[in-house]
Amino acid sequence: MVADELTMDGTVTSIRPTIRAGHKTIIAALDPDGTPLAVGHYHPANGTTELGGIGTLPTARRQGLAAAITTALVDHARDRGVSTIFLAYAEDTVARIYARLGFRPADSTLLIANQPARS
């Protein structure tokens, strides 16, 4: 299991119980030496999920890995009964990848955290 191997920073260790319980799925594209090149995850609830954490190492970009990870996440979620799948993005280049995979804009969202109040 890849998640068992990725424990250096403690991130996977802290979510391992969630993964093992089937509440979160992480999919990764690995280099032959086991290095994660691209990853993504989803955490379904009541037939709905957001795809998140989709990213590719800079040295592994332009190989279709983000698209492959996204497609694998969608297929995995659909196979498990998830009917509504959404995601958010911040860059137009990423939006084009998602559009090619069948995602369409639904609305705009602005999320701001830890910002000082403006007068």
Where do the protein language model's features map onto the residues?
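Conserved catalytic-core motifs of GNAT/GCN5-like acyltransferases
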Residues: 1, 88, 104-118
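Short glycine/proline-centered loop/turn elements that form peptide/ligand docking sites
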Residues: 66, 70, 91-94, 113-116
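Conserved acetyl-CoA-binding loop-helix of GNAT-fold acetyltransferases
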Residues: 56-58, 62-79, 100
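Conserved GNAT acetyl-CoA-binding A-motif
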Residues: 77-90
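Internal catalytic-core helix/loop-beta-alpha segment
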Residues: 1-27
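A conserved beta-strand-loop-helix scaffold within acyl/acetyltransferase catalytic domains
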Residues: 17-59
